[in-house]
Amino acid sequence: MPLRKPIKPPELRQFANVWTMLGQPSSEKEWTMEQRFRQAKKEGFDAVGWGVIPEAAKLCKALDMTYVCYIDAHFKTFKDRLEMAADTEPARINVQLADHDTLPVEAVEVWIKMVEVAETLGLTIDLEVHRDTCTETPEKTWEIAKRYKEATGKKLRLSFDYSHFALVKHLSPPYAK
């Protein structure tokens, strides 16, 4: 029997999301973006995550950290959003795709196009399981992953924020009163 090549174990890399540092150390004297990044490094984080921050790439290089860029995207906006995110030189891009009422078949169609554009830009993208998006329930997420694999032969790259499944089918006003 042929020997299998050893599989490298996964590495856990922790990142601080900038939104967790808003209003710090106080709402009266909030940290600058640089201070937030430096604080994350000081606390032992490997990376920082947030939206399209122009200075992200420079700050991460200076602090020997990586950046995870968050974007929301829809059928008409995904190309522009990916191009803007590319400027942050992210290790990966976390995508919150479409809306809660987007059908899985529609989500897969746009996701396939997004992956193609991301690859041409040299980007790695992950679809985040998130409230008020096409992945807001486990059933929809499973359906999207299944359809993506059927269409491409590849597994869907997912980013799980486990807290969001606790909030499934979150509807914002005026739909929920």
Give residue ranges: language-model regions.
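Active-site gating/metal-coordination segments in enzymes
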Residues: 81-107
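Acidic/histidine-rich catalytic cores of soluble enzymes
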Residues: 120-177
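Alpha-helix-loop-beta-strand connector modules within alpha/beta enzyme cores
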Residues: 56-75, 112-122, 146-151
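Charged helix-capping and loop-helix junction motifs
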Residues: 29-32, 104-112, 138-143, 171-176
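Hydrophobic residues within beta-strands of alpha/beta enzymes
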Residues: 48-49, 93-95, 125
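N-terminal pre-domain/capping segments
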Residues: 1-90
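Active-site beta-loop-alpha junctions enriched in small/polar residues
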Residues: 17-24, 51-53, 70-74, 97-100, ...
